Amino acid sequence: MPSTREIRRRIRSVKNLAQITRAMEMVSASKMRRAQRNVLATRPYADRLLDVMGELTGRAVGMRRGTLLEVRPVVQGVALIVVTPDRGLAGSLVANVLRRASRFILDEQEKKHTVEVLAIGKKGRDFMVRTHQNLVAEVTKLGDHPRLTDILGISTHVINGFLGGRYDEVYVLYSQFVNTLVQRPTIKRLLPIDPPHEPAERMVDYTYEPSQEEVLRELLPRFVEVQLYQAVLEAIASEHSARMVAMRNATDNAKELQRDLTLSYNKTRQANITKEVSEIASGAAALAEM
């Protein structure tokens, strides 16, 4: 049985740990709220861009070939953009994303497709290097408030790769923010773009300058950039949410362990007192018999 001194030392250690995890929980909660606001702030622009894309592609029939809309009959090259945090302590979030990435890569390789990986985030980068995947580009240290320009290198790489024939399909894997308790690993196809087609009765007769084909060609890359940026923002919100929940669970576990250690301390202390009283009583009885 450990001594009371050892138990007291463990109680102090657990108490300090609970204070740290509680502070991390509060920081993550604040960051999560800001990340949620960032996600919501970009949605109106993304939704409006999607509407314009649907209206344009509904009119520009036969313009898919040679653009980011082209669906190729034979797929050979596939690019996977994996979005993960730079840091850990986020529960099972990172493991779930990387497990989904491994399964996707294996499935594509079984189809005889060449898979190239682009990593956004240190955790994903390290995993791809460790498992000897074909990592061709990486972006790390984005922070909690990334800008669209921070990921332009990745989006430009896949756009040029698609137009040049290096990639026939491009996917992004990220953790979708559902709510505070649920973050879902999600794979979305970025290229070729499959925008919604507006019904004829909903179309408005706009005038495009210089032409609707030129406008569409300019919008297609912007659409890919916004979709990737949206995925990164979702992943950041998911990261802080998962870390907040993980730190809350760690705090609760530390408090429960502290209660158990306190109970053990009291029992050990009571046993020591009982032993001392018994020894004193035995000594007094022995003296009385002399």
Curated annotation (Swiss-Prot):
Gene Ontology terms for molecular function: ATP binding; proton-transporting ATP synthase activity, rotational mechanism
Keywords: ATP synthesis, Cell membrane, CF(1), Hydrogen ion transport, Ion transport, Membrane, Transport
TM regions (residue ranges): none
Coiled coil: none
Its membrane topology: Peripheral membrane protein
Primary role: Produces ATP from ADP in the presence of a proton gradient across the membrane. The gamma chain is believed to be important in regulating ATPase activity and the flow of protons through the CF(0) complex.
Assembly with partners or alone: F-type ATPases have 2 components, CF(1) - the catalytic core - and CF(0) - the membrane proton channel. CF(1) has five subunits: alpha(3), beta(3), gamma(1), delta(1), epsilon(1). CF(0) has three main subunits: a, b and c.
Protein name: ATP synthase gamma chain
